[in-house]
Amino acid sequence: MVTNMVKLRNLRRLYCSSRLLRTIQNGRISSVSSISLSKKYTTKSAKEGEENVERKHEEEKKDTLKSSSVPTSRISRLFHYGSLAAGVGMNAAAKGISEVAKGNSPTWKSLILSDSNIDRITNKFSKMRGVALKIGQLLSFQDEKVLPKELYEILSRVQNSANHMPQRQLEKVMAKELGANWKTKFSKFDKIPMAAASIGQVHAAELPSGQRVVVKIQYPGVKESIDSDLNSLLMLLTASSLLPKGLFLDKTIANARTELKWECDYNREARALQKFEALLKDDPAFEVPHVFPEYTTDNIITMTRMEGTEIMKLPKASQETKNFISENIMRLCLEEIATFKYMQTDPNWANFLYNGRTKKIELLDFGASRPFAEDFILKYRKLLTYATLRDRKGAYEMSVQLGYLTGLESQSMKDAHVDSVLTLGEPFRGDVDKSFDFKDQTVSDRIRGNIGLMLNERLCPPPEETYSLHRKFSGIFLLCARMGASVHCAKLFKEIFAYKV
């Protein structure tokens, strides 16, 4: 009897939740949209046979990229979120009734994240672009053991699955931004984008001067619907109860709101590009695209076309090359924090290209670039320095000063946090003449072992700077591990980051 009552209560919850989610369609709950992340503008070919290669790429793009209009108004986006919520809720309710009729006791998460619902969510996010895709990208850098595996599958699938604008919508955007005669400003402009991402798509083009460029075009309506889209997404994620409380979803959403608005400001991104171009102009390992201001607006950025290949798609790269790439990206990450106090925080590996001809790493997508306050940088450098020294007392005190801990946590929570901090410092510890082998590292696994306890017992969200900073660090660590790289982390840390404590 008790079991049946529990089953009926669960089904009632499913039914009520699906009705709650449908209220979005009636405008009773506000919604939100937007973001940017770029799925890189790269070319593999050399100049010889350029026309044939590019024609071949056009055909490949037609096969791999889907076209669909971007919902531009707040009402239309609200409707799409509402229909998604209703569809997921009703599908879950129907499946729940079917399972109970068979004598099974399905869990809430298994009903929400059924195969059909995973497909439904992925397809809708790809059509919506904007916030839906960006939140997916942000959360996808959480460890897969933190999130339900079905949700992690959705997030992984949506990372690079945006549809692109149909031709008519594209031409309307270009005419609005560059004028009715916009086509005369280019000697070439590929109609099919090289890539389509969360807030925009990228087209190969050529200026009348012969300069090869890429044109990054923001989807219409994405910027204006950030707040409403985020509100809708927050409601969906909260109603589904899919995320652990320790993720502090409201803080994650607030951070995403800020970053999305940054990334939708293409003039801001253009300034970030120019800043990094100046910072790295004499760096032998890096190259940054040059911005063409006369072809750049609030919603379009035109920049030089990088000729490298995504680092994870390098054909038969030697281990020496992989070590070179990994070590220099790690160096840049440390310099961004300690020296520049200004970081490109997007961890997407497709932001890094390697040019075999110039032997340089080409950097892309600066929409998520941000400054860090001097006080935060000072304390964070001290924290990691204590970690490399295995100084538990110093690491704990600095964690409280930074706001990671309140001091009121259980001893097990304090110990788990300090253990994780000291583990994070491990690659940067030891002999400066020795490299750290990421291929056999267990740092991620050991930090992962504390995640469950920390999610359950965390009393406060981490400082807002941490969301983007640790996302970048996590992405770089994973990159080095995927490359199987050996990196002189201790040497880099001592030269760039260490603070005398």
UniProtKB/Swiss-Prot annotation:
Impact upon substituting residue 198 to A: Decreased coenzyme Q biosynthesis
Outcome following mutation: residue 137 to E: Abolishes coenzyme Q biosynthesis
Motif (AAAS motif): 195-198
KW Kinase (keyword) present: yes
GO cellular component, one term: mitochondrial inner membrane
Keyword annotations from UniProtKB, A to Z: ATP-binding, Kinase, Membrane, Mitochondrion, Mitochondrion inner membrane, Nucleotide-binding, Transferase, Transit peptide, Ubiquinone biosynthesis
Classification via CDD domains: ABC1_ADCK3 (cd13970)
E.C. no: 2.7.-.-
Topology term for the membrane: Peripheral membrane protein
Pfam families noted in UniProt: ABC1 (PF03109)
Sequence ranges of Basic and acidic residues compositional bias: 45-65
Motif, KxGQ motif: chain positions: 134-137
Record annotation: effect of changing residue 351 to A: Abolishes coenzyme Q biosynthesis
Major location category of this protein: mitochondrion
Record annotation: effect of changing residue 475 to N: In coq8-8; impairs growth on ethanol and/or glycerol as a carbon source, but retains steady-state levels of COQ8
PANTHER family: COENZYME Q8 (PTHR43851:SF3), PTHR43851
Other known facts: Present with 952 molecules/cell in log phase SD medium.
Family from the record: Belongs to the protein kinase superfamily. ADCK protein kinase family.
Protein name, as recorded: Atypical kinase COQ8, mitochondrial
Taxonomic lineage of the native organism: Eukaryota, Fungi, Dikarya, Ascomycota, Saccharomycotina
